[in-house]
Amino acid sequence: MGALPWGRRLGLLCVVLLCGTPLCCGRPDPRRREALMQLEMIRGIGGSVVLNDKEKLLDEKLHQLKLQDMALPEFPPSMHFFKAKPLIERSPVFSFLQKMPKGAALHVHDFAMVGVEWLVKNITYRENCYVCFTADNSVRFLFSAGQPKPQTHCSTWILLETLRRKMNSTELDNSFIRNLTLFAEDPDEAYPDQDVVWTRFEQAFLVAYGLVTYAPIFKDYLYEGLRQFYMDNIMYVEIRALLPPTYELDGRRNSKDWSMRACQEVLQRFRAQYPDFVGARVIFTVHRGLNLTEAVKAVEEAVTLQRNFPDIMAGFDFVGREDSGRPLWYFREALELPEERGIHLPYFFHAGETDSEGTDVDQNMMDALLLNTSRIGHGFAMTRHPVVKELARKMDVAVEVCPISNQVLKLVSDLRNHPAAVLMAEGHPMVISSDDPALFEASGLSYDFYQAFMGFGGMRSNLATLKQLVVNSLRYSSLSSALKDKATAALLEKWDKFEDEKYLNPSLRQACI
């Protein structure tokens, strides 16, 4: 199970390279077969990782756990996540992954970080919280010192405290939770196509908007989001944030600078409570439905934010459904502005989150690389673009793979068929992330790690695969080189502790696995 020593690897490679007989002649040579198999293993994610003796023992145990899950009559990665989730939560492999240090989460959206139960059971019970009900059976929330002004296509605002006295609070809370997530008992019936699921997906963000943008809640929400990721053994987070205006109880609006200062304040407070947490940074995002003039303004805002908040401002991105938004090439004049002014504004573009081959949107990955993106968000379409894939590899641009998101949003049904399985087998630069975990009733990274580890890698992926993915998460982060080195050293120390205390101590091994 462990990676071979480099000497033996090179020897096997020599067998392949120096053996001059054609593959098709005579009887197949077992040595050549073994060499080719090892060459495939070496090329994959984790293929260059050499496991120590402790890791080899742990890897053997992990292999046995994987065999148990593979033998199940229902294999979770082949099922829709909403149906697979209970099976995943019973899996000892999932328990292993929960306890494993996972490094960084590099693709997470601001309004989908925190479990919706916390939003409903905590935030909606606070004073001055109003609700209205829309014509399409959704809800909106607003905090106000007095009766809010009527909102188009919504009922009269009702103080939640008053409403709860008139009806069953449990049923009301459950209805709010349903509006804040995409969960459905029969997801294929509820979401027959991408248009339907994307409409529901974007509506869920609108439901959360009035809660999360209330200034006091904004800070509490961010703190709770960091806490939930930290409890999943994540030490660093990069948050894609729209930075909409937050509002006060009297209706006053705050600027983006206020939001960034709030992020700094929350992060400082969080690190004081959890000193081993490395930190968090913001990738400022705008919707890809903007016109060019609006995009220019947004890029200029990003440059200003980077100048004013260099410690937490990581870069810029567009969000929203690629298939219904404008392609990156449309925005090139806006995106070229920083370089023309001698300013380096890092880009972290969503690209290739589509199955619409041959369209303008299908060129977004190529254009992202031409615009010198630091990473590619999703990259689902990459295996259909060999030149893009080769260029991304040469530029060392990692793909942020979000398995559950791609499945729920109907790009793929069986995760064994996800294009990232090919990227993983080829050792393409990649990280695993969770995109919008709260909307999928997931949390942190463990669920997505499970789907990738079991679905993409099958029995070939092992502890070395996991270790490489975890280290990649810091390697491809926006941290400075010095901070990356420091964070990676801390991560590897946590990794060693994870091995020793949780899985190699005989008194704990059975309890933990």
At which residue positions do the language-model features occur?
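Metal-cofactor-binding active-site regions of metalloenzymes
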Residues: G2-I513
